């Protein structure tokens, strides 16, 4: 049916609505006469009640104004800045990211669509046609609840072209919601860094059912790679790594990516993070680890709370929260396992020692008297590094309880104990 303002005058519609108010005509009769729906009917009725003297049904097309010279100039400047990054062979940036550029423009008050940016890019010669995609590993969500599978990995990159060294990005991502639960940059990849990531996830979100990781030696002992002995005594997975010991205590399973395609499923989030973070650091001349961490936090917030995920077609944080409300979560509340009184004895580095005949144990060439144990007795050491204080808290366990504790500087034991 033709538009309302082309079929009736404002006075005619006004008469019909007045008849409805007086009880002479029903809503259905007026809707049928005007050819409108319920929503449109009540919108017209509200307009008549609020502004009877200026009631109108005229249609006013609202077209977005053309971009002004200032906006066009900023778009051009940002595109040319991106072109410098793409042309720089020393940077791990091989193409344009128009969505990221649109977000940068929005911060400066320029609201423009990505399509418009692409049009301007073509005009300036700042455009690359997308390459034909190869067959990729299935990106579908393989879980039906949050906490069922946590994708966890680390990636080494030069996150800023102005930095003097590469840093490791460690992330934990919930498979169902695609929400990044943990993300941090560290100077070196250690068991302790991954243990801290697991601690953050478990204490802030709950204990997940299982982790999905690759075959890095931090996560898994593999014979023929991690042993120098040719006469094999221990096979693959016969030794639990420090990280896996923590997960075993919390009754969380681990599954491994057994193919390059499956491994790519974990590493895919690093692609967009690397691209956006490197671009931001290059454009802002950022070089320090703390500054890059700020860029990372901003990017994770945008991804979790503002961006619609291409696979789920939902914003990750909203999907995560909705799953919780609909009881689609297998996260278990964080509680200490039986026999433990402190989380320090869960999230720690474990080593074994045997006391001598004088109840002393040796660490980094130093002897320490341990009370509450027998001569020649085996004890377990729980080491908790504190890099800010440059010390390690050492908690000595025997008979399923802590019997002694002391602190040592990290510099005294970091050569004999690998965190």
Model-derived segments and their meaning:
Residues 25-26, 97:
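Residues that mark the N-terminal boundary/hinge immediately upstream of a DNA-recognition element
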Residues 111, 115, 122-180, 187-209, ...:
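Mobile-element integrase/transposase regions
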Residues 16, 41-44, 75, 101, ...:
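Mobile genetic element proteins and their domesticated derivatives, centered on retroelements
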């Amino acid at each position: 049916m033709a538009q309302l303002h082309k079929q009736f005058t404002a006075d005619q519609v006004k008469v019909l609505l007045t008849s409805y108010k007086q009880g002479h005509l029903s809503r259905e009769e007026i809707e049928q006469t005007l050819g409108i729906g319920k929503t449109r009917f009540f919108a017209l009725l509200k307009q008549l009640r609020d502004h009877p003297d200026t009631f109108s049904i005229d249609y006013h097309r609202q077209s977005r104004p053309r971009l002004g010279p200032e906006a066009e100039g900023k778009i051009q400047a940002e595109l040319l800045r991106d072109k410098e990054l793409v042309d720089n062979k020393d940077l791990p940036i091989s193409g344009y990211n128009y969505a990221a550029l649109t977000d940068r423009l929005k911060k400066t008050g320029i609201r423009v669509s990505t399509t418009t940016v692409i049009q301007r890019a073509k005009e300036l010669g700042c455009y690359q046609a997308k390459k034909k995609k190869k067959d990729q590993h299935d990106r579908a969500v393989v879980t039906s609840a949050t906490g069922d599978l946590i994708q966890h990995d680390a990636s080494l990159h030069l996150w800023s072209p102005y930095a003097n060294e590469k840093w490791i990005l460690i992330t934990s991502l919930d498979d169902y919601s695609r929400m990044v639960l943990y993300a941090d940059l560290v100077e070196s990849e250690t068991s302790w860094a991954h243990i801290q990531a697991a601690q953050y996830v478990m204490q802030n979100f709950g204990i997940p059912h299982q982790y999905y990781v690759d075959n890095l030696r931090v996560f898994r002992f593999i014979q023929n790679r991690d042993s120098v002995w040719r006469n094999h005594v221990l096979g693959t997975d016969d030794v639990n790594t420090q990280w896996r010991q923590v997960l075993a205590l919390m009754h969380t399973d681990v599954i491994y990516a057994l193919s390059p395609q499956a491994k790519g499923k974990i590493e895919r989030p690093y692609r967009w993070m690397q691209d956006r973070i490197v671009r931001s650091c290059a454009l802002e001349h950022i070089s320090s680890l703390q500054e890059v961490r700020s860029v990372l936090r901003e990017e994770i917030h945008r991804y979790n709370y503002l961006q619609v995920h291409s696979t789920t077609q939902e914003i990750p944080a909203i999907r995560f929260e909705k799953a919780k409300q609909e009881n689609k979560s297998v996260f278990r509340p964080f509680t200490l396992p039986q026999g433990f009184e402190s989380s320090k004895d869960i999230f720690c580095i474990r080593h074994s020692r045997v006391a001598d005949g004088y109840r002393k144990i040796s660490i980094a060439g130093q002897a320490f008297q341990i009370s509450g144990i027998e001569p020649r007795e085996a004890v377990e050491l729980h080491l908790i590094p504190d890099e800010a204080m440059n010390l390690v808290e050492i908690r000595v366990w025997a008979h399923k309880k802590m019997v002694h504790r002391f602190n040592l500087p990290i510099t005294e034991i970091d050569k004999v104990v690998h965190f």
